[in-house]
Amino acid sequence: MANIVVKRLERTPIDEIPVEIVERKGIGHPDSICDGIAESVSVALCKMYKEKMGVVLHHNTDQVELVGGYAYPELGGGCMVSPIYILLSGRATMEVLDKETGKIIKLPVNTTAVNAARDYLKKALRNMDLEKDVVVDCRIGQGSVDLVEVFDRKRTEIPHANDTSFGVGHAPLSTTEKIVLETEKLLNSDALKAEIPAVGEDIKVMGLREGKKITLTIAMAAVDKYVNSCADYVKVKELAKAKVEENAKKYLDGHELEVCINTADDDEDCIFLTVTGTSAEMGDDGSVGRGNRANGLITPFRPMSMEATSGKNPINHIGKIYNILSNIIAEDVAKIEGVRECQIRILSQIGKPVTEPKILDIEMIPENGFELEELSPKAKEVAQKWLDNISEVTERIVSGNVTTF
């Protein structure tokens, strides 16, 4: 059995502390654009490697940079005058020696990466003209010999950790966390875009809970071709606010809610108007890992890892595997009857099997009437089950069924 430690979480439950702050950067935020591209490139490379070689080869595509363009948004429709520049970098296996034939097999890494990036942009940013508004530059290089060796060792057996690092997770989400997450999902949903097409994808939701009152401060880009006047713009905000308030009722659990959208607006002279739906068109730059953590949120009142999850290889990169695994374990432990709140930390040692962390730390707050001693064996069983089936985590990632930002 792995080194699994269970102890009491010595803190007030998150929903009972007097103040809580939670943030989510939406899919059109420049940092989230980079996260989304990095992960899409990694998933595409995984599929290409499996198709051509039967296995996922070494790669890390977590170095995506976005340099903002320049635009002239106008009521009724403006234009881009300088495109957004996106740099794909990182490392990937581009050549493989076929031991049977002695020949070098060249793999279409850069082509796969560029196509994946463009496909993601097409899906994420509905109003962007990919032929004119964005330049995608691929500079992915061959992987480090040492890291490839660690990655390839005993490929048919358990992968070995590429680094000494850690992952963290928590569950269940607090009321504030749920509302922040679901608000961004709502505003960027297909259904809402069909009803209010002027709502762009660059959305940031900042949630503040003070006692039983939650305030959402939302930055929401508007798409200029759907907004013909300042009155139209104000109407878009009013419609979006009403949708947010209605949706939040499902999660409020007795809390009061205040929704504020684009608080910097002067509704005559200064409004959040864009051509493409993202502030990346106006010099707002982005990078992988500067935004949401693996659970899709930024939670300063919870433990967090500073490691970027998107774009890292899903086989043995601890910054990816353990952050995602921590959240999965936390979610399952939180389902155990009697567990009110759970935090997970998993630490690796470089070169050791990913199924054998140096420590897997579980902290729990029991519900009233339950003791830690009776919950501990159940929590350990959940954690061990996931360590024994860690390949399932990899499969979820490769299939694109895991959120990394």
From Swiss-Prot:
Binding site for ATP: G141, Q142, G143, S144, V145, D146
Enzyme class, broadest EC rank: transferase
Metabolic or biological pathway, per its Swiss-Prot or TrEMBL entry: Amino-acid biosynthesis; S-adenosyl-L-methionine biosynthesis; S-adenosyl-L-methionine from L-methionine: step 1/1
An example Gene Ontology molecular-function term: methionine adenosyltransferase activity
Keyword list, A-Z: ATP-binding, Magnesium, Nucleotide-binding, One-carbon metabolism, Transferase
Pfam families: AdoMet_Synthase
Cofactor: Mg(2+)
InterPro entries: AdoMet_synthase_2_family, AdoMet_synthase_3, S-AdoMet_synthetase_arc
Family listed: Belongs to the AdoMet synthase 2 family.
Designated name of the protein: S-adenosylmethionine synthase
Organism field: Methanococcus maripaludis (strain DSM 14266 / JCM 13030 / NBRC 101832 / S2 / LL)
